[in-house]
Structures are given as C-alpha cells and as structure tokens.
C-alpha cells in the first residue's frame, strides 16, 4: 500500500465504525444474576411501561400473574381495564432461558410453541431484594415494564425505578405511568 492509501483506509474504517459505535453507547443489557421463581410467582401490578401494540388498549389496572406449573413452565395471565371499562385478558406461558432471570414468554397457541418466533424475551433486569418491585425488559431495550407487588408506589420509589431504568440505557420519554 502507498502512504496515502493507508490513511485513506483508516479514515474510511473510522467513518463507518464511528456511527455504529455511537448508535448504542450503553453496554449490553444483563439480567439480574439470580431469580427465585417461587418468590417471583404471584401477581404483579404494572406501574409503568414503554408503549407496545399488545397493550395499546390498556388504560389502567394492569396486572401480570405468574403461576408455576409442575413441568417447570410458568403460566402467565395478563389483565387490564380498557378505557370503556371492559377487561382485556391475555394468557400465555413462560419458560427459563439460558440464565436464571432470562425468561421467554409466548401468547401464541401451545401448538405453535415449537416455532422460535412466537417466543419473546422477558428479562428481569432489576429486582428488589424482597421481591417488592421488578424492572423487566429485553436486550433491544424496546420494551420495559416497572412492576410492583402493590397497586401503587410512592413518587420517590417510582423516581428511583425510573432512574435505574435510565442507568440501564432506557429512553423513558414515552414512558406510560399507570393512573
């Protein structure tokens, strides 16, 4: 290579690598190291979430109930109240992924469960030591749920959970806080 070719190649490499490196300044998302499914099971109240099509009709009273099945899977029942007062219910199942707090969830019929695209990542990325609150997300940071065992949390707790989500790399400009 000539003397002018090397700087040109380096400049082009940096030009293409720069935007890719700047696209996501946050390290890869990691789940919490341990998750006791016995303690995690039960009903969680959604305090806040990032928008998603599947919950577009949910106006309030959003809950997720997890029940351990004998075979090691988890029955999932999501419920919410629509703006007209009617209830919306979605039932599915979850299974462990390749780490204790990496779960996969599906709401497609059981007979489709062999298809990989019906499963979505459900990672517990922050968890109270006493399992009073949890932050759930997925590797792309497109989805986020702030959950609590209580129907409401005080403003200080919510501010702390939002700050934690921001530290984990979430953009909360579109965060929906349940009434």
Placement of each model-derived feature along the sequence:
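A beta-rich soluble binding module of mature secreted/lumenal proteins
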Residues: 19-179
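Positively charged n-region of N-terminal signal peptides that target proteins for export
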Residues: 1-5
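Bacterial N-terminal signal peptides
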Residues: 7-17
């Amino acid at each position: 290579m000539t003397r002018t070719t090397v700087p040109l190649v380096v400049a082009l490499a940096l030009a293409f690598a720069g935007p890719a490196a700047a696209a996501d300044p946050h390290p890869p998302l990691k789940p919490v190291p341990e998750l006791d499914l016995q303690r995690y099971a039960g009903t969680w109240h959604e305090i806040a979430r990032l928008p998603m099509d599947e919950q577009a009709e949910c106006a309030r009273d959003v809950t997720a109930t997890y029940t351990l099945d004998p075979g090691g899977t988890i029955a999932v029942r999501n419920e919410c109240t629509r703006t007209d007062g009617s209830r919306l219910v979605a039932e599915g199942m979850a299974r462990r992924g390749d780490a204790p707090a990496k779960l996969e969830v599906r709401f497609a019929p059981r007979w489709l469960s062999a298809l990989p695209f019906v499963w979505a990542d459900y990672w517990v990325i922050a968890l109270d030591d006493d399992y009073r609150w949890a932050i759930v997300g997925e590797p792309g940071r497109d989805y986020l749920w702030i959950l609590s065992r209580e129907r409401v949390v005080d403003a200080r707790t919510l501010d702390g959970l939002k700050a934690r989500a921001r530290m984990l790399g979430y953009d909360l400009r579109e965060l929906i806080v349940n009434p």
